[in-house]
């Protein structure tokens, strides 16, 4: 669920995000400043709000830290892999001629990798921690950060040929599928976070307990919640070590 506490994984992710960006301030593309003045102010506001929220949220919730491996750990693995790809993107940029085309190019087939990779990584970290606050903050950041990068990319590659109709249809369908899948995950996590918070607020004598028990030789995840600790209700139990938390 949601647990307050220091997140060392959050700190690691922030360091992986900030260190190359700090180095980049000394290696900006020579024409970068002329593009900055054209940035959409609304997108810039979303970007700044998202950055502030993420920097705080990933450090104050311990749900992002390592815990007993289970199927849900795949989200953390994916998040780490995306951040490693992000570092790879920066290594390629620093070894290039450091032009605007290098800065806004794709990496491993991922468009505007400098923006999309960290946004996706923090979103997956939010799923791993089952933390709606980080998911929401990442969406806000993504709207601004990826939006700004996409607009700059169009300016930089202004001579790029338009893609065919089939390519554009596939792109729309693919994006729509991603929105539906990850939007659904976000809603489910948000609903569970809301129920947990509401239970803590409305019941000082309540109970909120989760863990793993051995049943018939198989480790199973359980969740117990109730407004009265003397009369709790088991609301989640299933076979295998996997947990949506």
List each language-model region with its residue ranges.
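Hydrophobic beta-strand anchors of alpha/beta hydrolase catalytic cores
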Residues: 234-235
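Membrane-helix boundary connector in multi-pass membrane proteins
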Residues: 102, 119-135
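Membrane-interface helix-loop junction between the first two transmembrane segments
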Residues: 22-39
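Short substrate-entry loop that stabilizes the transition state in hydrolases
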Residues: 231, 240-245
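Membrane-helix boundary elements
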Residues: 49-77
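Membrane-proximal helix-loop-helix units in multi-pass membrane proteins
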Residues: 68-120
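An N-terminal hydrophobic leader/cap segment in hydrolases
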Residues: 180-211
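A short loop-to-beta-strand scaffold at the N-terminal edge of the catalytic core in hydrolase folds
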Residues: 214-225
